[in-house]
Amino acid sequence: MDIPRIFTISESEHRIHNPFTPEKYATLGRVLRMKPGARILDLGSGSGEMLCTWARDYGITGTGIDMSQLFTAHATLRAEELGVSERVHFIHNDAAGYVADEEYDVAACVGATWIAGGVAGTTELLAKSLKPGGVMLIGEPYWRQVPASEEIAQACGVSSIADFLTLPGLVASFDQQGYDLVEMVLADQEGWDRYEAAKWMTMRRWLEENPDDDFAKEVRAELTIAPERHVTYT
């Protein structure tokens, strides 16, 4: 069980696997007003940066679930590095359909709502692991400008215009599901640049070190199109 290899390769040097920066995560942790000892479940936890830094800075405890063997190993090492390995734990598992045995104060899925088929399915999934009165934390891309055609949407790297909503549409969707939106922190262009552009050097160095790998052709193809796709559509 693992994520597609292109992500394992291209994001192998990432600490954060979405367009948030460390500063954005610090802001998000602060505005959530979590008390020390608050328990967080993070589905699609990646390399664990959110849980590890929040354990260090805000005294939370937590569990992260991720399908990537590499990222889960990185998360465990990061917890040890920051001295929080007794507070946060990371499990290599499929986050799709994952329901915790215990209820959490915060149930999160940041940038991985595909685990439940989108935002609506993810809210339903997270609610099953959330204490009454708890906080649900969801990170989701949105269209700043709706593509004029399905072809343009696919050029952005998604399968359909329907994959994402506009920001007003996304905000309205929570109300439609019966939830109050109580805070918001938005990624910015710098965060998108850091998330996307950091992949390019990683892929280039991987190609230099693995020229005869059977997967090199796919990595080369992605490296060729990724920069122009990013500056055109992000």
Residue ranges and their predicted role:
Residues E49-A96:
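Class I SAM-dependent methyltransferase SAM/SAH-binding core
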Residues A38-G44:
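Conserved class I S-adenosyl-L-methionine
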Residues V99-A107:
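A short acidic, Gly/Pro-enriched loop at the edge of an enzyme's catalytic core
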Residues A120-V135:
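A short glycine-rich, Lys/Arg-flanked "PGG" loop and its adjoining helix->strand segment in the class I
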Residues P141-I161:
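Short, glycine-/aromatic-enriched active-site segment of Class I SAM-dependent methyltransferases
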Residues N18-P36:
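Conserved alpha-helix/loop element of class I SAM-dependent methyltransferases that forms part
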Residues V106-V119:
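A short SAM/SAH-binding and catalytic strip from SAM-dependent methyltransferases
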Residues E183-T234:
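Conserved Class I S-adenosyl-L-methionine
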